[in-house]
Amino acid sequence: MKILLATFFFQLSLVAFSQNKYGVKPILLEQYKASIKSNPEKELVDLEKFIPHIVLDIRYATTNNFTKEKIYNMAKAYARKPVAAALRKAQADFKKLGYGIKIYDAYRPYSATVKFYEVMKGDTTYVANPYKGSRHNRGCALDMTLVLLKTGKELQMPTAWDAMQKASWPSTPVANPEVRKNRDTLISVMEKNGFKVYTTEWWHFDFVGWEKFEVMGIDFEELEK
């Protein structure tokens, strides 16, 4: 009997591990719905509807990204309610300068973080660690740049989005004064409005207070229902 019980619990543990081999249990749709009933601040907001003139260029809904694969089935940008509110304030500040926001990525389902980690073979210099989950998984991170409001043209930045090189680091000196000004303007306005730039990516901004929000594993199709 003891052997049978031991075998049974061992098999159960194997099933649990195979379902979540990195030890993170992202909340799913029903848990998310329950969480926003108790705390409306946890709601995911559609940024395209919430922020006037925002531009979406969701690269993970295309093959134009470092994986060379289409990761998302829909080109959507969601963020938690206070994140969206802070971004709308930043958009108003950028508008005074003649700029608008272009979003490359916002909320990211946990499954995408696992995919990126495995593509990078465990190197977490430029992708998140699935043993912890990412700020994107919490709806509290944004990948973005600036565009000219009059033309929609992107401002020149030190590198392309998702360029995995030291030139992408916000701390890296930039010789071109216009490019340096563009990068520094993006960072200063975002940090004024409650975000923190990521140490290795000039385009990545974490909402200050992201720790209060759970890792989520909800697909965009579910959010759109």
Residue ranges of predicted features:
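Short, well-ordered surface patches within globular domains
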Residues: 112
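Extracytoplasmic cell-surface/polysaccharide-interacting catalytic and binding patches
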Residues: 18-104, 119-200, 209-225
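Short active-site loop/helix that positions an aromatic residue
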Residues: 116
